[in-house]
């Protein structure tokens, strides 16, 4: 039985958000965050702490030596689920977007129908990592730039 674990980013570097697969970790677990990410600790469904670069000791309700005893009433599963999400902190550049099909507009000056397509490039950097995870991503296992562009595609088309 492990008393302590080390959690670090092991996902695809192109992901905007990656959830570490280990969810049943102890209060002595070490979290290592590299310079290109922030890490958000979620305990019992609550976004608790946002960690920056460095090594951090996580404090969770899971106590290593009595873990088996505590997990007995729940069939071996922890009653205190804990998750760690790694959120990219790098500037995302040249993300292409476009809307499927065309938009038909009536030109009032020349009385003709215009068939217009929309596309472009998107550059951004996540400034509020907690809000990005909670409001845009949710608690998905991973979230990439293609998924983000797909979410914005509908919003862009709605306002054009």
Residue spans for each PLM region:
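N-terminal hydrophobic membrane-entry segments
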Residues: 1-160
């Amino acid at each position: 039985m492990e008393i302590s674990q080390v959690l670090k980013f092991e996902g695809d570097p192109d992901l905007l958000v990656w959830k570490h697969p280990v969810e049943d970790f102890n209060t002595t677990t070490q979290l290592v965050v590299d310079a290109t990410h922030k890490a958000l600790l979620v305990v019992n469904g609550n976004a608790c702490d946002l960690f920056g670069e460095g090594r951090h000791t996580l404090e969770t309700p899971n106590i290593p030596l009595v873990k088996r005893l505590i997990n007995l009433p729940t069939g071996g599963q922890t009653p205190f689920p804990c998750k760690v999400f790694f959120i990219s902190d790098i500037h995302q550049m040249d993300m292409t977007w476009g809307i499927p099909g065309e938009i038909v507009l009536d030109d009032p000056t020349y009385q003709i129908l215009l068939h217009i397509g929309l596309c472009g490039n998107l550059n951004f950097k996540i400034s509020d990592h907690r809000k990005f995870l909670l409001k845009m991503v949710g608690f998905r296992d991973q979230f990439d730039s293609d998924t983000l562009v797909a979410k914005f595609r509908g919003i862009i088309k709605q306002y054009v």
